């Protein structure tokens, strides 16, 4: 089974959006038995909190369930447990590396590395959850293409 961990700062906006958008794509492709998806934070600020209302609004509008999701922090052991550690921006990469240590297998990457490169803007600061969703969707589509090869 392929295991993917999406990572952002607080695990309430971008990474849970990516987690559930990707799960939806995987389910529609009939790959749920081959790919496992989760998400986590690099910080402890939001641990135990549900997804942000902006993320919930996007997921609700798409009919995508996020039941039972609460923010958790990335752990050092996640490096051994996951095949892909997919961050939303360069800041997340730096902070994730501080938690997991060395990356000899090259598991750390950014979601938009699968869709032309760049960072996914944090809607916590921009307030633009629609733009974040478009970037997340594009990145997840690119990642799924790689996984299906």
Language model segments and positions:
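Conserved active-site segments centered on acidic
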Residues: 1-81, 145-149
């Amino acid at each position: 089974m392929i295991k993917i961990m999406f990572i952002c700062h607080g695990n309430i906006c971008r990474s849970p959006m990516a987690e559930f958008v990707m799960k939806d794509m995987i389910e529609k492709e009939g790959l749920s038995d081959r790919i496992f998806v989760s998400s986590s934070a690099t910080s402890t600020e939001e641990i135990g909190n549900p997804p942000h209302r902006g993320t919930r609004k996007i997921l609700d509008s798409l009919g995508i369930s996020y039941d039972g999701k609460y923010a958790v922090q990335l752990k050092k052991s996640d490096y051994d447990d996951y095949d892909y550690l997919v961050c939303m921006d360069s800041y997340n990469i730096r902070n994730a590396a501080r938690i997991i240590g060395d990356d000899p297998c090259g598991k750390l990457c950014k979601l938009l590395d699968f869709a032309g490169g760049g960072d996914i803007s944090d809607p916590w600061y921009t307030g633009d959850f629609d733009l974040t969703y478009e970037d997340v969707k594009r990145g997840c589509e690119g990642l799924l293409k790689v996984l299906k090869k």
